């Protein structure tokens, strides 16, 4: 059994991996007797992660931090300075590459930031974009303009706004939808799979036919990263 930990900008997500399945866990009552590996990735800092790693060390459990590399198991990073690619983006790409082999993918992780990455059917990452997340996009306008205001009860939709709050929120949503659509010509592939993850992934997925929302995409990527990294070290 593996303990998989994803430390994002605003939260820590932890799951157990056993029998090729993601399982829920209670961080206050982890089954240390059954855990063989801890695999983690950090975008932000976390005192909770440090405490978990200390517990793992106390139980003599090996810990592995996921890192970005130029290549991994047939997947190639587009960045010349690959260390500058966020590990969460790399893990989402690894998961998409593994789950949808030989398929072109647009991978969207919609959290504090919205990242859009383009992957061709040969496993070549073509690059991507980093946008403000929907909340950050709307907040930046309300904080930096005098007459634009928000309403927390107003939902995000793709309709024209008929008042300031839904003009603001709908504008943020359609801007993000437009950015995702702009990625399609880079692949020129009618069978492109669009995959969404993150807090607003489900909302965005509803705007694209035959797309997929996978809330565990980055967590799955952690497991696949470990497996691919282990295999590459054996060669």
Curated annotation (Swiss-Prot):
EC number of this enzyme? 2.7.1.33
GO cellular component, alphabetical, reads: cytoplasm
- Cofactor(s) essential for the protein: NH4(+); K(+)
One example of the protein's molecular function in GO is: pantothenate kinase activity
What are the GO BP annotations of this UniProt entry?
A: coenzyme A biosynthetic process
Which residues of this UniProt protein bind substrate? Answer: 79, 86-89, 164
Q: In which pathway does it act?
A: Cofactor biosynthesis; coenzyme A biosynthesis; CoA from (R)-pantothenate: step 1/5
Which named protein is this? Type III pantothenate kinase
At the top level of its lineage, which domain of life is listed? Bacteria
